[in-house]
Amino acid sequence: MGFLSKLIAKLKPKKSVAKQLKEEVEKQSLFQTNNKTYYQGLKKSATTFAKTINELSKRYVNVDEQFKENLFEGLVLLDVGYHAANKICDAIIEQIKLNRITDFQLIKELIIDQIIVYYIQDKLFDTDLIVKPNFTNVYLFVGVNGVGKTTTLAKIADFFIKQNKRVLLVAGDTFRAGAIEQLNQWAKLLNCDIVLPNPKEQTPAVIFRGVKKGIDDKYDFVLCDTSGRLQNKLNLMNELQKIYQIIQKVSGSEPSETLLVLDGTVGQTGLSQAKVFNEFSKLTGIVLTKMDGSAKGGIILAIKDMFNLPVKLIGFGEKTSDLAIFDLEKYVLGLLNNLNLDNKEN
């Protein structure tokens, strides 16, 4: 599978500050994953896709409309999205015909190749978290209820605290008392400071106080939790827009990161969430959680296709160490792990 590494290496961006920081603490467990983690976390998705492709290999005679239809079906079942699935299928068939490929093992490798090429296209996203040096970096976490915003925020806080960075948590989920208590418990566990809402205080006011304190007291990071909100509730989306504008006004710049946390099991529903949240707050990236319970691993390609947004973090479970910076090569290898690429028999 060396061709994957070579293909990705050609398009890798220069090291960001976050990349350099990450390398300084490479002995820390958070955000470090090996191939096995991806294989286990994407097991359901890999099984779904492999079933289609391996069945296709048994019936394979030549490249025709039936072949394309079955390949398309396999990609759609992963929630790659219709547009992306069509483009990938067309590219695969074009390469098969151009190079007169008949060995299905080579076709399997070509499928992987074209998925990588499609995701990268003109460039490979830098999936590291944005970190501005000598600056109070404000991270805003948004999403619907129950996707894991608060837990994700705490895991990222843990990551930076282990680098001896000063981190301030802001409990902006004023709709749910449990969320405030949850984040407060995380603050105690991580031994970091937190801004809690006053009685009846609304989210925008809490965010204002938190960001101002973070800047005035020269914290390295201010991590802002927000209430879960459905994308079809206009009043709540308008409040999110107000929160975003408050951060801009207080800090003098946009948040370093505005991360939409998506439940990886919801598939195409996540795309409609991303569309609306991106309209009301300028998203910088996606965090996909609960991928260990999802058979829809192709959603990452659909997000890239529709919004040109990077998936920055991917979660495979509830433990602190189960959140990883998204690694394209490990992701693709995990997604296609059951394709039996080392087996020379169809």
UniProtKB/Swiss-Prot annotation:
Q: Which domain of life does the UniProt lineage start with?
A: Bacteria
Gene Ontology molecular function terms on file: ATP hydrolysis activity; GTP binding; GTPase activity; signal recognition particle binding
Q: What is its EC number?
A: 3.6.5.4
Report the top EC class in one word: hydrolase
Say which species the protein is native to: Mycoplasma genitalium (strain ATCC 33530 / DSM 19775 / NCTC 10195 / G37) (Mycoplasmoides genitalium)
On assembly, the entry states:
Part of the signal recognition particle protein translocation system, which is composed of SRP and FtsY.
- Which HAMAP family does the record match to this protein? FtsY
Location in the cell reads:
Cell membrane; Cytoplasm
What is the official name of this protein in its record? Signal recognition particle receptor FtsY
GO cellular component annotations of the record = cytoplasm; plasma membrane
User: How is the protein disposed in the membrane?
Assistant: Peripheral membrane protein
Q: Which positions are annotated as binding GTP? A: 143-150, 225-229, 289-292
Q: Which UniProt keywords apply?
A: Cell membrane, Cytoplasm, GTP-binding, Hydrolase, Membrane, Nucleotide-binding, Receptor
State the family it belongs to.
Answer: Belongs to the GTP-binding SRP family. FtsY subfamily.
Give the gene that encodes this protein: ftsY
* Listed GO biological process terms: protein targeting; SRP-dependent cotranslational protein targeting to membrane
Purpose: Involved in targeting and insertion of nascent membrane proteins into the cytoplasmic membrane. Acts as a receptor for the complex formed by the signal recognition particle (SRP) and the ribosome-nascent chain (RNC).
Family annotation (InterPro entries): AAA+_ATPase (IPR003593), P-loop_NTPase (IPR027417), Signal_recog_particl_SRP54_hlx (IPR013822), SR_rcpt_FtsY (IPR004390), SRP/SRP_N (IPR036225), SRP54_GTPase_dom (IPR000897), SRP54_N_sf (IPR042101)
Q: Note the Pfam families from the entry.
A: SRP54 (PF00448), SRP54_N (PF02881)
Per the record, what are the reactions this protein catalyses? GTP + H2O = GDP + phosphate + H(+)
